Amino acid sequence: MTISSFLRVRHSLAAAKCVLENAKQSFSSHAAFAEHAKLERIRNIGISAHIDSGKTTLTERILFYTGRIKQMHEVKGKDNVGATMDSMELERQRGITIQSAATYTMWKDHNINIIDTPGHVDFTVEVERALRVLDGAILVLCSVGGVQSQTLTVNRQMKRYNVPCLAFINKLDRTGANPYRVLGQMRSKLNHNAAFIQLPIGVESNCKGIVDLVKQRALYFEDHLGLTVREDEIPQEMRAESDERRHELIEHLSNVDESIGELFLEEKTPTEQDIMAAIRRSALKRTFTPVLVGTALKNKGVQPLLDAVLNYLPHPGEVENIALIEKKGKEPQQIMLDPARDGKSPFVGLAFKLEAGRFGQLTYLRCYQGVLRKGDSIFNVRSGKKVRLARLVRLHSNNMEDVNEVYAGDIFALFGVDCASGDTFVTNPDLELSMESIFVPDPVVSMAIKPANNKDRDNFSKAVARFTKEDPTFRFAYDTDIKETLVSGMGELHLEIYAQRMEREYNCPVILGKPKVAFRETLVAPCEFDFLHKKQSGGQGQYARVTGVLEPLPPHQNTTIEFTDETVGTNVPKQFVPGIEKGFRQMAEKGLLSGHKLSGIKFRLQDGAHHIVDSSELAFMLAAQGAIKSVFENGSWQILEPIMMVEVTAPEEFQGTVIGQLNKRHGIITGTEGSEGWFTVYAEVPLNDMFGYAGELRSSTQGKGEFSMEYSRYSPCKPDVQEKLMQDYQIAQGNVVVDAKKQQKKKN
């Protein structure tokens, strides 16, 4: 290298460093800009993916390149610091993101709010909450692992909340990287109309840069931090492939976009602007998914991804947000919220996450309409409580920055607000409107829990009270039959994390029992009931009669219970119907076969009778309970168990062993695939048969096998499992085992 070229390189590095320092120093002015940014210059995005796909590393790079942090850190805390977005000590140790950290940053005069979500399936509720309040998302896929179980879950969640997304195929530098295979999986498994808008220039150790198919240029990321992005001609050896992939991109767009479709049919070549506009239109409608590539760890492809967020993901004004106006005695009416950032419409916000911070309860909100200023009073629509706001803060991981006001489209946090996740807040209590609530899945695993030392009971109570309020999938109950305290959640890891947090944050070590599956009891066939509750013991008596049908719901509704009032006339006065429903729901809390909840049943109240003096709501509640007991005696019942979707990846030589293990655990193989010495098997396995599988898989694959699982559905359990559950329950109740067999009715 000549002296002049060396000086040029040193000068460019110094310039890049200077630019970065200026970005850091001017971020206070960025915060002021963020408060008053135009609607078109705001993006609310989430970063979602399967565990260990590189989401948190990608977020760390985004924060660095936008000047939000001064230096990058590794995720698993190898540098004793850990990633910025992993603020909890437990997260830094495990190298997984447990809570959705929120932050905001600036890129090319646009304010970007980012939620970094967990990838582990046990923390699915965090992903649900994040997607509910976002306008767009980046779906991160590993170029080796491809589409995995949690990717399918995240994809379903994005579909539920209609969130447009970009796909970013990460980890091009890893051995076995194959972005083309991942694109094929996106089309076949996720049913995405997806195409590359970038191509990698080499993979694994030869990963040099990327080709931008829209601009038809090669991009190289220079110096060891990748700060300088150099444009160049597409390498000669890649031009044929680039032309072919660009044509494929136009073809996929022409299937969903009219303008490009016309140009395609007329065999005209669309311009760069035509393609960008078509990608944006179709991405917003969720009819096309642009696919980008890169490696966050090696600092390649992050800046073009940020450009794509601005170019192809929606601003708050392009997303339809609906609220419900609810008047007593009338059907809820849907209205569109006004996304304008002018403060002319009244404030409407949604609480999507609760957290116990250092200064009290922290409530994360999204402002959907209007403006909220420090010192304003807001009302909780559900509870009617009024709160005056002393502080408004923006979040950067676990750091807070005070702001004076927030506008429609902003994500922010409040202190000292007593509410639940999914509550709607307004400044005008006469509005009587609420946002749709956040979907919360039911827990599938329970464990007995108790403090290791009796002296820690107070801290234990505080921890449980806080965690159950923060996380609606973490449940706490006392079982009077077995005299044990139970916690329930989305998996073993979910409950273990909370146990460790109790010890770490509340100095309260706990003892966890063996995992227990949340079985359910349901009817096999409809069963009629006609029950009279009559009691006379001096003074006013009790008289109530209920008749109707208890029937099973369709399989896709077998985790819910329903009550319908089909009575005509005044045989059952309307003021007593709520008592009947209450009696039914109380009985549904505990079945007679195994002591588990009833689900997948519908109580149809068809007729009854009352007494002018002796009837009361209590009498009808007891009559409903008696009716359910009669159906227990006369109906045909079965026990349901949760079925999990399991994905196992291991070296090919262990394929037979792994499939044998899954068959032994009563699994049904639904698919297999393999590439470059590794295979992946997909199966549906009862959760009750999955305990202890992690250790078995490790020992049988020399520690190389990995698996993940997520809840799929409830299905009838095998006869021998049902028999054992019934016997165990009867023994626990102190009844004769033979009586349990009498409880099991023949299936119709």
UniProtKB/Swiss-Prot annotation:
One of its GO terms (molecular function) is translation elongation factor activity. GO terms for biological process: mitochondrial translational elongation. Its main location: mitochondrion. GTP binds at residues 49-56, 116-120, 170-173. Pathway: Protein biosynthesis; polypeptide chain elongation. One of its GO terms (cellular component) is mitochondrion. CDD domains: EF-G, EFG_III, EFG_mtEFG1_IV, mtEFG1_C, mtEFG1_II_like. Pfam families: EFG_C, EFG_III, EFG_IV, GTP_EFTU, GTP_EFTU_D2. Transmembrane segments: none annotated. Residues 40-318 form the tr-type G domain. Keywords: Elongation factor, GTP-binding, Mitochondrion, Nucleotide-binding, Protein biosynthesis, Transit peptide. It is found in: Mitochondrion. It comes from the Eukaryota. InterPro entries: EFG_II, EFG_III, EFG_III/V, EFG_IV, EFG_V, EFG_V-like, EFTu-like_2, G_TR_CS. Mitochondrial GTPase that catalyzes the GTP-dependent ribosomal translocation step during translation elongation. During this step, the ribosome changes from the pre-translocational (PRE) to the post-translocational (POST) state as the newly formed A-site-bound peptidyl-tRNA and P-site-bound deacylated tRNA move to the P and E sites, respectively. Catalyzes the coordinated movement of the two tRNA molecules, the mRNA and conformational changes in the ribosome. PANTHER family: ELONGATION FACTOR G, MITOCHONDRIAL. Belongs to the TRAFAC class translation factor GTPase superfamily. Classic translation factor GTPase family. EF-G/EF-2 subfamily. This is Elongation factor G, mitochondrial. It comes from Aedes aegypti (Yellowfever mosquito).
